[in-house]
Regions:
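Acidic, serine/proline-rich low-complexity intrinsically disordered regions
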Residues: 4-247
């Protein structure tokens, strides 16, 4: 497992390489209050209001806030149930319509978030908010052996899929932000979420840094509409093998 400083450096590199508008979010599930760093915001205690978890993610990535959300800080039931902070209601299955993973009840007392580049703790999961072009560049940097590990979740609740799912199942997760992300946390319409288990992050950065030397790196993206556009040599060879070089 990487050190805290190494995780911080990963956060800096992700922002720089992908030109991210907001900070990747370091997420740690809490088993005891002693793990809450000094200065972390407790919404109900410190500001006398509650937040949905998507709003806490938004404040962390935009305002660079470290936030600890215990059950008394939450204002949306999905995260409380998914993170195992409350028992599932009797007589109903809240996961029936849009299935999602949940931690065992009582395993965790809360969730801690901070910008990855300044987090004072080792995360369990890192959530990257990006536009679709940034996400494409990130995914294209993956090696062939990693591609089968990329999965997607496209239904609510994204707060569960971005935290519980990668922790329980491993792998990489592309997540469509749910309505709460848009309506309450002010997620841009073009943004996607990408969740990475913390132990996979250093390797992801190795591949992403190597990818910067190739033409598909995000900073090399540009728009153009041109017939007979310049092609790489392997394109030319393929067309020659097909007998299409003279057409």
């Amino acid at each position: 497992m990487a050190t805290i400083k190494e995780f911080n450096r990963c956060g800096e590199e992700l922002e720089k390489i992908l030109l991210l508008r907001t900070s990747p979010v370091a997420v740690k599930m809490l088993t005891k209050k002693a793990d809450i760093p000094a200065g972390a915001l407790r919404p109900k205690k410190d500001r006398k209001y509650h937040l949905a978890q998507c709003q806490a993610f938004a404040m962390t990535r935009r305002e660079r806030a470290t936030i600890a959300m215990l059950k008394e800080d939450h204002w949306c039931p999905a995260a409380l149930m998914a993170y195992g902070m409350v028992p599932l209601p009797e007589g109903m299955n809240p996961t029936r319509m849009h299935p999602y993973e949940c931690f065992s009840y009582g395993k965790y007392i809360g969730i801690l978030t901070a910008p990855l580049k300044t987090a004072a703790f080792k995360p369990d999961v890192v959530i990257i908010y990006s536009n679709t072009s940034q996400l494409r560049s990130l995914l294209l940097s993956f090696g062939h052996d990693e591609i089968p590990q990329v999965n997607g979740r496209f239904f609510p609740p994204s707060c569960a899929h971005a935290v519980v799912t990668p922790m329980l199942k491993g792998g990489y997760w592309v997540i469509l932000p749910d309505p709460g992300e848009y309506q309450r946390a002010l997620c841009d319409e073009g943004e996607m979420m990408f969740a990475v288990p913390a132990e996979k992050l250093p390797g992801l950065l190795v591949g992403l840094n190597k990818f910067q030397e190739q033409g598909f790196a995000y900073r090399n993206n540009y728009y153009f509409m041109q017939g007979d556009f310049p092609r790489p040599d392997f394109y030319k060879k393929m067309f020659k093998d097909w007998g299409l070089e003279d057409y």
